[in-house]
């Protein structure tokens, strides 16, 4: 069975989902039947073809009237502001990938369902009353056929949750802190300009900028036992893609740095293959651009202090890795729903 997908919002994640679908060779499993985006279709086609972070798309892209063509595949283009007015029923949409970054409540999900979609997957953290929040590779096996409105969490949650799980299962985490070193994003300014967050009034290319983050809440959503025992801070840095996460945890069992690295390396080669990767090469952030893994552990940066404090550095392409997980979760939702 081929899953019929519609994309709502054709920004960074929406476009990368389409590119990842074609580059990964999964078109027999997923077909994009429609894209809803307020921007004009010519601009959509141009930005799909030419991307500053990920280069030229290898597939031919063209726009004709209300259709976007990728190769010979025709995708209907919509410019609808009202979720209730979207023609998902007419198009036979199985799963809507809502990549707007704006919608994330159950009410918004129900609007897609009312328009005729069978399932909804948000590309960002949603409200607590959604049917499920998935970090693929960790808890997708908990998806049920009755789960209609699902969140794929965030890029940073997808990056750090697998590593936390591995360390907790092996050594028993007592508490932890996370620092996200994230590339600049569209909600920042090119030059100094007004913004409700005064730090985000400043030019993104000229400063390291502290930003509020809800990553600690995202961690405790998956690990309730860590409530009030994990804290997170975030900074944005003057790069356009790839994120690093500095994770520090105190653990119950004594451990050495080489043992931590061996654990994570074996996981990357085994149970978490394709989700977690491991490297000891002297790499920098740009080397992880276009990497499809959720997390890449940098073994050269692992430290252990006093046998119970572990520090690790984990990289991710916050666009490409997450876009690939959107496809994985879509297929997981369809598998349990339509088998």
Curated annotation (Swiss-Prot):
Biological process per Gene Ontology, one example term: pyridoxal phosphate biosynthetic process
EC category name: oxidoreductase
Substrates-to-products reaction catalysed: D-erythrose 4-phosphate + NAD(+) + H2O = 4-phospho-D-erythronate + NADH + 2 H(+)
Pfam entry (one): Gp_dh_C
A GO term, aspect molecular function: erythrose-4-phosphate dehydrogenase activity
Keyword Cytoplasm: yes
Cellular location(s): Cytoplasm
Annotated residues for binding of substrate: 154-156, 200, 213-214, 236
InterPro entries assigned to the protein according to its UniProt record, in alphabetical order: E4P_DH_bac, GlycerAld/Erythrose_P_DH, GlycerAld_3-P_DH_AS, GlycerAld_3-P_DH_cat, GlycerAld_3-P_DH_NAD(P)-bd, NAD(P)-bd_dom_sf
Positions of NAD(+) binding: 12-13, 81, 318
Annotated site residues (Activates thiol group during catalysis) in this chain: 182
Pathway, per record: Cofactor biosynthesis; pyridoxine 5'-phosphate biosynthesis; pyridoxine 5'-phosphate from D-erythrose 4-phosphate: step 1/5
Catalytic residues (UniProt): 155 (nucleophile)
Keyword NAD: yes
Record keywords, A-Z: Cytoplasm, NAD, Oxidoreductase, Pyridoxine biosynthesis
A GO-annotated cellular component: cytoplasm
EC number: 1.2.1.72
Superkingdom assignment: Bacteria
General function of this protein: Catalyzes the NAD-dependent conversion of D-erythrose 4-phosphate to 4-phosphoerythronate.
Subunit structure: Homotetramer.
Protein name stated in the entry: D-erythrose-4-phosphate dehydrogenase
């Amino acid at each position: 069975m081929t899953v019929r997908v519609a994309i709502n919002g054709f920004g960074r994640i929406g476009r990368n989902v389409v590119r990842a679908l074609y580059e990964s060779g999964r078109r027999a499993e997923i077909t994009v039947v429609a894209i809803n985006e307020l921007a004009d279709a010519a601009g959509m086609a141009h930005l799909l073809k030419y991307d500053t972070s990920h280069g030229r798309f290898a597939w031919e892209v063209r726009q004709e009237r209300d259709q976007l063509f990728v190769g010979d595949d025709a995708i209907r283009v919509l410019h609808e502001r009202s979720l209730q007015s979207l023609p998902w029923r007419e198009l036979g949409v199985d799963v809507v990938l809502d990549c707007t970054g704006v919608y994330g409540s159950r009410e918004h999900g129900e609007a897609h369902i009312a328009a005729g979609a069978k399932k909804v997957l948000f590309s960002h953290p949603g409200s607590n009353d959604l049917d499920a929040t998935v970090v693929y590779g960790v808890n997708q096996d908990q998806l049920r056929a009755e789960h209609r409105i699902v969140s794929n969490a965030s890029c940073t949650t997808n990056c750090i949750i697998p590593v936390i799980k591995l360390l907790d299962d092996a050594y028993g985490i007592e508490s932890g802190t996370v620092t996200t070193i994230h590339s600049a994003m569209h909600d920042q300014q090119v030059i100094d300009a007004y913004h409700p967050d005064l730090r985000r009034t400043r030019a993104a290319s000229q400063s390291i900028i502290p930003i509020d983050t809800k990553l600690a809440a995202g961690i405790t959503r998956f690990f309730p036992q860590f409530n009030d025992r994990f804290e997170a801070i975030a900074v944005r840095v003057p790069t356009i893609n790839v994120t690093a996460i500095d994770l520090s945890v105190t653990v119950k069992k004594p451990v050495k740095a080489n043992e931590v690295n061996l654990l994570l390396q074996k996981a990357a080669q085994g149970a978490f293959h394709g989700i977690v990767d491991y490297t000891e090469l002297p790499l920098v952030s740009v080397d992880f651009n276009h990497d499809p893994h959720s997390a890449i552990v940098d073994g050269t940066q692992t430290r252990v202090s006093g046998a119970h404090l572990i520090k690790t550095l984990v990289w991710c392409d916050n666009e490409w890795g997450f876009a690939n997980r959107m496809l994985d979760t879509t297929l997981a939702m369809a598998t349990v729903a339509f088998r």
